[in-house]
A protein has these predicted regions:
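Conserved glycine-rich Rossmann-like NAD(P)H-binding loop of the short-chain dehydrogenase/reductase
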Residues: 25-43
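Rossmann-fold cofactor-recognition segment
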Residues: 44-60
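Catalytic loop of short-chain dehydrogenase/reductase
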Residues: 95-100, 117-154, 163-167
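N-terminal Rossmann NAD(P)H-binding glycine-rich loop of SDR-like oxidoreductase domains
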Residues: 5-23
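Conserved mid-core segment of classical short-chain dehydrogenase/reductases
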Residues: 81-95
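Conserved hydrophobic beta-strands of the Rossmann-like cofactor-binding core
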Residues: 3-6, 75-76
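Conserved NAD(P)H cofactor-binding loop of Rossmann-fold oxidoreductase domains
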Residues: 76-85, 123-124
Length: 167
């Protein structure tokens, strides 16, 4: 049985990843899903075998993931938190660091701490004109994800790039 880790398991992309894993691997997939928000004791991420609540940057959350398994066939990273709604050019180093704290920085940490065959991160198109005026510091986090995708590492890197398209 292969282990699959989904960070951001309650969001649209994370829940879609869980459904796709189930559809492709069925009961042979052991899905561990992380979520963070207002804690709801007893809450289970739909389709996951194990639900881990917590901020992925917290060492206790990492230990909870390791307590299930240290070896994963696949990790899907679909969580983000950062400043949007202002022009990208107005993002300060502090806002970028705050955005990266959850939106990018945990990815290489997870790669180094766990044995993961492939990591797929989720990005969006952030360089089209109408996004440049509203994507704020988050654009830098998405850029970091895309640059990381091209780097070699312990795991295979991939990125799903989705979003709005210019017509």
């Amino acid at each position: 049985m292969a282990n699959f880790l989904v960070i951001g398991g309650t969001g649209v992309m994370g829940s879609s990843a869980i459904k796709a894993i189930r559809q492709h691997f069925g009961a042979d997939a052991n899905i561990i899903a992380n979520w963070f928000g207002k804690e709801d004791p007893g809450f289970k991420v739909e389709g996951a075998d194990h639900t881990i609540f917590g901020d992925i940057t917290n060492p206790e959350c990492m230990e909870a993931i390791k307590s299930v398994s240290n070896k994963y066939k696949y990790m899907f990273y679909a969580t983000a938190l950062g400043q949007v709604g202002t022009p990208v050019k107005d993002a300060t180093p502090e806002l970028i660091a705050e955005s990266n704290r959850l939106s990018f920085d945990p990815i290489p940490v997870l790669e180094n701490e766990l044995d993961i065959e492939e990591i797929t991160a989720y990005s969006t198109f952030y360089v089209i004109k109408h996004q440049l005026c509203s994507y704020g510091a988050m654009a830098y986090s998405k850029e970091a994800i895309e640059k990381w995708t091209l780097e070699s590492g312990k795991s295979k890197h991939s990125c799903i790039r989705a979003g709005l398209f210019e017509s």
